[in-house]
Structure formats: C-alpha cells, structure tokens
Swiss-Prot record:
This is Rho GTPase-activating protein 36. The gene is ARHGAP36. It comes from the Eukaryota. One of its GO terms (biological process) is signal transduction. GTPase activator for the Rho-type GTPases by converting them to an inactive GDP-bound state. It comes from Ailuropoda melanoleuca. One of its GO terms (molecular function) is GTPase activator activity.
C-alpha cells in the first residue's frame, strides 16, 4: 500500500492542471454537436447567399477572378485562358460585298436559329432598335416633317456603304449607329437604381440603348472600365417565351421533350422567330411543339451553351463527390459569360419545375393528378448533348485529359446535378463574398465605399416601404422573415462577418452588426451620402467609373 502513495500524490497534483483543458474541450464539443458550430459560426449558410444578378459589373469581374484562382488551385482548368475571346465565324467577304451593294446585309443577318448565342441577342437588339426607328420615321412622315428632307444620290450612298464596310471590325456583329456611343445624343445619370420604383426596367432600357460590354465575352481579362451597376439579364426571346409557356401549360404534360410533335408547326414557329416577328405562344399552341422548338434552339446553336473552353472542366466534376461537384459547378458558372449564365439559369429553372411534377399527386379538389414522368435524369438524357458540345478547344483538351467514364455519361451526370441544384448554382456563398470584397477593396477602395453606401440606401428604402405597407394594410404575419429576405437580397457580400477587408475610417461600415441589427446607422452629415470618386488606375490596368 505504501508503494501506491507516490502515484496518488502525483494524480492529486495533476488534477487541477488537467481539469480546465478537459472542461474547455467538452464545452467546445458540446457547441459543435448541439449548437451546430463554434461561437460566431452560422451553420445556415444558405440564408446568407446572394444572387449573382445583384452584383455590379466590378463585383462580377472580381467574382470571375476568384473563381479562376480557385479552379486553378484544384487543377480544373487545363486549356482555359482568361484573355482568350470566344470564337466568332469569319464572314464571306465576297458575299458581304455583294449584299452591301444591294442593301440586303441587315435583312439576311438577323436570324435566331443556327447561330451563336451572342449573335442572337445582338440581332434581337438590332431588330428592336430598327422597329423604334421605323416607328419614329412613320410619325415624322405622318406629320409632314420629313417631306422636305433631301435625299443623297445613289453614288454617295454607295460610297458611304463601302466606307462603313472597311471601317467596321469584322470580328464583331455590326450594329446601327444609334447603338454606338457616338450615335447617342442623350444620356441618363442616376445615383442609385435602388431609389427608383422600377430600377430593373430602367437598367434594362439603359443597357439596350447602348452596348456597355460586348455581348458574349467574359469580364475576366478585359481592360475596359467597369460599371458599378448590375448587368441586365441577357436571355433570348425564344428561350424566355418557350420556358414561360412550358411553365404555364406543360408541367403536367406526360413525356414532355420526348413525345412526338408536329414538324410542320415547329418549322412555322422557327421561321416566325427567324423573321423577327412578335411571336405570341397562346393556349392554341401544342406543348410538345413548343418543347421541341426549345430543344432545337440549343441543339442547332453553333456554339455550346456551356462554353467550349470549359467542356472538360464540366465533365471532370462528374468524378467528384456530390458536395464537391456542386462547389466546382458553382465556380464554373461564375466563369461563364453573362449571356450564357443567364440563359442557362432560365432553362434550368424551367426544367426543375418540370421535375417537381414528375410524380403523381393529389390536387386541391382531392382528385389524383398524374405526373409528367420526367425526372432530372430523363431531362439530362435529353439536354446532355445539347448543352455540352465538344468543339475545337474541347477536342484539343480531351487529348490531354482522360476521364474514367464515357463523355456522354459524364455530361448526363453534370446536367442532372445542375437541374437538381439550379437555385444554388447562381448564388454566391459567404466565403466567396469575402474574397470578392477583398479584391474590390484592393483595386478601388472608393468603389467598395460606393457599393456599400448604395446597398445601405437600398435597405433603407425597403424598410420605409415595409413601414408604409404596414400602415396602409394589415400587419405582415412574418415580418421578421420578410425583413431577413430583404437583407439577404440587398447585401453585395457578407458584411456581417468578422473577416471583412480593412476599410479606412472614412468609409461606410456594415449595417447588420450585433448592436444595431435591423436599424441601419444614419450617415454622417459632414459628407454627402453618395460621393463620386475620381478615376483610379488599378494595378491590373482597369479603371472604374460611377454611372
């Protein structure tokens, strides 16, 4: 017994030293397992995600830079080059000369099917502007203002067309003079689109009146000035019309995209869209005809909706675990040109709604409602080869990168994952928001200051509107949830986190801190709320301006 006394004394001596670390460790394990994380950690990340459409051009550029570096670190970009422009077909010079002399260039180039996606959007903008000019000329002729206008002779018009042909760039779609900055005679200047009642409509109108950024190109690698306004959605008219019709009339159609359709009716609809007519898809149309028209649009596109230089990168995600695949798909979507990502989002949204009605259900009246039998796997089998096409860059890349599975099987797996998670692909998670904020701060602190002030005013306007609605009508039942939704859609990045970039004292701070959550601080009175900073030349050679 006497030999055990030294051990007992040693245990009694070490107990006071060991117990505090053990208690701390047990408390930490309790927080992780029961509360969902350490103090200050929010386990529900989806409530803090924001849409990429709420980001400005500058933030979208920094988002693409962040996605590029993340994918390079994961070895997902073998042949991708950020400064490489998307391929554009070279026009036939002799044929173009002949059409210009006859004045038929505009009539034959404004198509919808069988061309690249950016060309479809440019043709729609050109047609819309041409209709506006035609209507204005008709008004002038009806009022007699154009009766005395002198017309140039045939020789002058011929030399004018030849001069415009040689002076225009051949690698870009030709636009009317009214579309260029030189042709605009008026301008609109606003401090913030959030102060307007219909800011989205005004933003779309302003971006239709002038091409601020070449359609079909990435922001990454550009040396132009970046705007601090969001980018208007760029979706072809045929895609929007077909998706809206299917969501309204085709969710319960059994075997949509797979059953037989009328080839004659699809050809008529295709010709109407190619001619630039105002096509209205009403109740008289067949759902399967409209579905076939939408499928033909993506199948006959010269380029791929998922860019050619990212072909193998998308296929490589099929070899990952589901959570890792979703994260990689998010980064790849960020790298896509705005027109491609917007069109992809619209298509995936419609396809996801179809999958929600694939099984039988009980209606409101208690009757059995049959499902459409189109799961995400079935839709991926239909659209897999139409969305992921192997082009020139993809063929060169596939020689160096070999997959363990067939390319068609991988494409089906990728499209299925995108349909199932369409609402997450176009959201920016908090950790990416922090990196975007840091990159904006490094390039232009004044731009970060302006973006935060504008979003602060947006939140204040939303709060005032909610208070007015509460006074005019009954109180909102879920006011806290509604206010949280407003905050989630208004923040350009995760401002509530503790890892914010270092901002000087003169800049605005977060509106959603612990002491004043829901009560934005009042800006200081000794300086204007929205100041216009001077142009700043960043290290990358990119300037920034405030619209």
């Amino acid at each position: 017994m006497g030999g055990c006394n030294p051990f007992l004394k040693a245990a009694r001596t070490l107990c006071p030293r060991i117990m505090p670390p053990l208690l701390f460790l047990s408390a930490f394990i309790f927080l992780v397992n029961v509360l969902g994380g350490a103090p200050g950690h929010n386990p529900d990340r989806r409530t803090k995600m924001i849409s990429i459409h709420s980001l400005s051009e500058l933030e979208r550029l920094k988002l693409q830079e962040t996605a590029y570096h993340e994918l390079v670190a994961r070895h997902f970009l073998s042949e991708f080059k950020p400064d490489r422009a998307l391929p554009i077909d070279r026009p036939n010079t002799f044929e173009k000369w002949f059409l210009i002399l006859r004045g038929q260039q505009r009539a034959v180039s404004l198509k919808t099917f069988g061309i690249r996606l950016e060309e479809v959007l440019v043709n729609e903008l050109t047609r819309r502007k041409h209709l506006e000019l035609t209507a204005a000329m008709q008004i002038e002729e009806s009022t007699g203002q154009a009766s005395g206008r002198r017309r140039g002779n045939v020789v002058q018009r011929l030399f004018g067309r030849i001069r415009r042909f040689f002076s225009s760039r051949r690698d870009e779609p030709s636009l009317p003079r009214e579309f260029t900055r030189r042709g605009r005679r008026g301008a609109v200047s606003v401090d913030s689109l959030a102060e307007l009642e219909d800011g989205a409509l005004l933003l779309q109108t302003l971006q239709l009146s002038k091409i601020s950024f070449p359609i079909g190109q990435r922001l990454l690698g550009s040396k132009r000035k970046m705007s601090l306004n969001p980018i208007a959605k760029q979706i072809p008219q045929v895609v929007e019309a077909c998706c809206s019709f299917i969501e309204k009339h085709g969710l319960s159609a059994v075997g949509i995209f797979t059953l037989e359709y009328s080839e004659e009716r699809v050809r008529e609809l295709r010709e109407e869209f190619d001619q630039g007519l105002d096509v209205v898809l009403d109740d008289t149309q067949n759902v399967h005809d409209v579905a076939a028209l939408l499928k033909e649009f993506f199948r006959d596109m010269k380029d791929s909706l998922l860019p050619d230089d990212l072909y193998m990168s998308f296929l490589l995600t099929a070899t990952l675990k589901p959570q890792d695949q979703l994260s990689a798909l998010q980064l790849l979507v960020y790298l896509m040109p705005p027109c491609h990502s917007d069109t992809l989002e619209r298509l995936l949204k419609a396809l996801h709604k179809i999958t929600e009605n694939c099984e039988d259900s009980i209606g409101i009246d208690g009757q059995l409602v049959s499902g459409n039998r189109m799961t995400s796997t079935n839709l991926a089998l239909v659209f897999g080869s139409a969305l992921l096409k192997k082009g020139r860059f993809a063929k060169r890349e596939s020689r160096k990168t070999r997959l363990g599975i067939d390319h068609y099987v991988a494409s089906v797996n990728v499209v299925r994952a995108m349909i199932d998670n369409w609402d997450i692909l176009f959201q920016v998670p908090p950790h990416i928001q922090k990196q975007v904020a840091k990159r904006v701060w490094k390039s232009s602190p004044e731009a970060l200051d302006f973006i935060r002030r504008r979003n602060l005013r947006k939140i204040q306007s939303a709060r005032i509107k909610m208070e007015e609605d509460a006074l005019l009508s009954d109180p909102v039942e879920n006011s806290a949830e509604a206010w949280a939704a407003v905050l989630a859609q208004s923040k350009p990045f995760d401002e509530g986190s503790s890892e914010e970039p270092a901002v000087p004292p003169g800049t605005a701070h977060s509106h959603d801190d612990e002491e004043g959550a829901g009560n934005p601080p009042i800006p200081e009175q000794d300086r204007p709320l929205l100041r216009v900073p001077r142009e700043k030349q960043a290290k990358t050679g990119i300037g920034y301006f405030f619209p």
